[in-house]
């Protein structure tokens, strides 16, 4: 039975450290962020500045409350920050084989969970979905006060990125309607 679990990403981070001989954050900076030109991305630390705070609605729903971030640096399972321009650079780096080979990307976006979920499949690190018969791959993430989605449509060569510092609100509608615009779905 397929079920998404962040602990697999913690294990992947440990494997990266063992195989590369580098700590996870250094490896990601050198092999993804730097190669893709992602200068506004990284992992939270106490000195991180110029980021937007996550927000949640009060219990009464009449105000917004800032969510306090954890004190740690993050991990291979989360705790990173970025912006739209850097995620577009990431998408372009994938397409142009700057961070993985064409063969590796093909392997990453091939279905690994044998179609066990009706609406999506899973590859290596990517959720694979079809919208109106158009293939897409990407990944999202949520945490208290945060929503994120990155999706690439290879047939139309369109990438869309959503960042939200809220864990409710217009995120789902924005994601759904943007996908409809890209695919022509009604």
Give the residues covered by each predicted segment.
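Short, surface-exposed loop or secondary-structure junction motifs
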Residues: 1-142
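Short acidic, gly/pro-rich beta-turn/loop elements at beta-sheet edges
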Residues: 118, 136, 160-162, 170-172
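Glycine-centered structural positions embedded in regular secondary structure
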Residues: 125, 141, 159, 174-175, ...
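Short, glycine/serine-rich, charged loops/turns that create anion-binding
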Residues: 94, 166-167
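Short, gly/Ser/Thr-rich active-site loops of penicillin-recognizing serine hydrolases
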Residues: 167-186
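Short, small/polar residue-rich loop motifs at catalytic or cofactor-binding pockets
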Residues: 145-146
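Short, well-ordered beta-strand elements
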Residues: 138-139, 149-152, 156-166
